[in-house]
């Protein structure tokens, strides 16, 4: 497994988190 494959799986999750948290996942969720 490479980092790029892991990123492809994680990015959609981050996108959903951003939508749920008001499009500001670094400041709202983390």
UniProtKB/Swiss-Prot annotation:
One GO cellular component assignment for this chain's record is: cytoplasm
Q: Which residues form the propeptide?
A: 1-19
Cross-link (2-(3-methylbutanoyl)-5-hydroxyoxazole-4-carbothionic acid (Leu-Cys)) at residue(s): 20-21
Question: One GO molecular function term?
Answer: metal ion binding
A GO BP entry is:
copper ion transport
| The protein's enzyme class | oxidoreductase
Question: In which domain of life is the source organism classified?
Answer: Bacteria
| UniProt crosslink position (Proline 5-hydroxy-oxazole-4-carbothionic acid (Pro-Cys)) | 26-27
Q: Where in the cell is it found?
A: Secreted; Cytoplasm
Protein's recorded name: Methanobactin mb-OB3b
Native source organism of the sequence: Methylosinus trichosporium
Upper lineage: Bacteria, Pseudomonadati, Pseudomonadota, Alphaproteobacteria, Hyphomicrobiales
Q: Which gene encodes it?
A: mbnA
